[in-house]
């Protein structure tokens, strides 16, 4: 699989041709983590061609605290969407996308794409209260239904695409797969990747490489805990084990013996 984690430079025409050939002809896997501030028209064109359009906005919300000035936040609370694709074996987990995120226009009901056997699907949606703001550079923002995205429609921040041979709607002849996220920091080079982000990334890589059997929540690393017991508590535990428990067993045995003799 080929992963592009937050590319700040666009693909050249030659690189785009190589990537397209790898994906369509060799049925390779692609994973894009888009940098919302980067200008990548060639990469975006490839995605739009297959039903996923980066919008160039910023997903945000406004925090209102009584007595304080309202403040916009770019840390987006998102939920994974169950269904076909890399999230099908993951429960409806939630996480935060840190930094700046752009929303995605996912054409999962487009008749033309369906006829061409191209299946885009949303994978992540922002929680209630977030929207795709087009005029995000201004200090004070508010949702404008004429130019912004969301409310009441869901704001998608990740999507998958599966493309098969024309007429092969069950993908029995194989398929080309890609996953795109509108945020470059789902996996952090500083080692601050969330558990949900790591699970989603591994699931995406396994899915685009047709290794569905490996998709799921990764096992947690065993952690050793030390239980500190004071001298007084230790003496109490010893008394319970030496006197109380044998005494209790003796009493129960005596009761049973008496009842049987009666």
What is the meaning of each model-derived region?
Residues 1-213:
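Acidic, S/T/G-rich, low-cysteine, solvent-exposed domains in lumenal/extracellular/periplasmic regions
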Residues 73-80, 229-240, 254:
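Short, charged low-complexity intrinsically disordered segments located at boundaries
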Residues 186, 216-241:
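Short, aromatic-rich amphipathic segments at membrane interfaces
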Residues 210-217, 249:
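Intrinsically disordered or highly flexible coil/loop and linker segments, enriched in small
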Residues 246-259:
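Alpha-helical transmembrane segments
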């Amino acid at each position: 699989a080929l992963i592009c984690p937050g590319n700040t430079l666009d693909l050249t025409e030659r690189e785009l041709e190589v990537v397209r050939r790898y994906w369509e002809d060799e049925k390779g896997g692609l994973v894009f983590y888009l940098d919302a501030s980067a200008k990548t028209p060639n990469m975006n064109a490839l995605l739009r061609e297959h039903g996923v359009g980066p919008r160039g906005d910023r997903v945000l919300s406004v925090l209102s605290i009584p007595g304080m000035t309202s403040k916009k936040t770019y840390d987006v609370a998102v939920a994974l969407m169950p269904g076909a694709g890399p999230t099908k074996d993951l429960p409806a987990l939630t996480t935060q996308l840190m930094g700046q995120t752009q929303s995605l226009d996912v054409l999962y009901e487009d008749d033309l794409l369906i006829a061409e056997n191209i299946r885009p699907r949303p994978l992540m949606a922002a929680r209630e209260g977030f929207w795709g703001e087009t005029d995000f550079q201004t200090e004070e923002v508010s949702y404008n239904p004429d130019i912004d995205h969301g409310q009441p429609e869901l704001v998608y921040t990740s999507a998958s695409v599966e493309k098969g041979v024309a007429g092969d709607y069950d993908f029995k002849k194989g398929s080309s797969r890609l996953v795109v996220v509108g945020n470059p920091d789902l996996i952090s080079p500083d080692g601050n990747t969330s558990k949900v982000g790591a699970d989603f990334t591994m699931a995406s890589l396994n899915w685009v490489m047709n290794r569905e059997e490996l998709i799921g929540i990764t096992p947690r690393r065993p952690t050793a805990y030390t239980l500190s017991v004071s001298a007084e508590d230790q003496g109490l535990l010893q008394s319970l084990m030496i006197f109380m428990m044998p005494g209790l067993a003796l009493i129960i045995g005596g009761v049973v013996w008496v009842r049987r003799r009666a």
